[in-house]
């Protein structure tokens, strides 16, 4: 086995979505450290068991929204009640002078390997490890775990699950134009 991983042991015995995310992230780290990259994959779960696994390959940024809409339709069709998304991503601090600048375009961006688990019931879990590149050498920093947060990518899933808008979404700063300010 290329990665030293037993596929039968990739998922958590507990069947809990957060435990699945942690277990899958350990595997993703091994794959990344072996290959120097990780493809974007999503696993849909029902009652703690994986029922759908797919690679997502957006051609451009706008395709991500369409892919998540299709994923939500599939989740609804097969009765998925949770999802784990594993991917590489860019992150950057907000720039008040350029509020619409994407992280990939920021000079202050960092690259991360991430896993985000969401479910019909319960809070999301986000795992991340900073990608450290030195020429051809690549390694990952320690894993950081965060429960909660505003993971807008999953809005289409929340919609089909009829999940209330998370409170974390209301706590975000409002736009610089005053819209939404009281």
Protein language model annotation of sequence segments:
Residues 1-71:
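N-terminal domain-onset segments
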């Amino acid at each position: 086995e290329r990665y030293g991983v037993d596929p039968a042991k990739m998922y958590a015995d507990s069947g809990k979505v957060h435990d699945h995310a942690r277990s899958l992230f350990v595997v993703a780290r091994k794959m990344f450290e072996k290959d120097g990259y990780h493809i974007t994959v999503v696993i849909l779960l029902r009652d703690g068991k994986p029922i759908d696994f797919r690679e997502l390959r957006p051609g451009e940024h706008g395709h991500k929204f369409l892919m998540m809409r299709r994923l939500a339709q599939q989740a609804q069709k097969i009765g998925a009640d949770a999802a784990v998304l594993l991917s590489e991503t860019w992150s950057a601090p907000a720039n008040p002078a350029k509020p619409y600048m994407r992280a990939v375009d920021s000079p202050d961006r960092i690259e991360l390997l991430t896993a985000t688990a969401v479910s019909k019931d319960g809070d999301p879990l986000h795992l991340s490890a900073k990608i450290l590149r030195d020429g051809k050498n690549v390694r990952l920093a320690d894993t950081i775990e965060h429960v909660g947060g505003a993971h807008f990518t999953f809005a289409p899933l929340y919609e089909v699950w009829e999940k209330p808008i998370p409170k974390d979404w209301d706590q975000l700063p409002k736009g610089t134009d005053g819209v939404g300010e009281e």
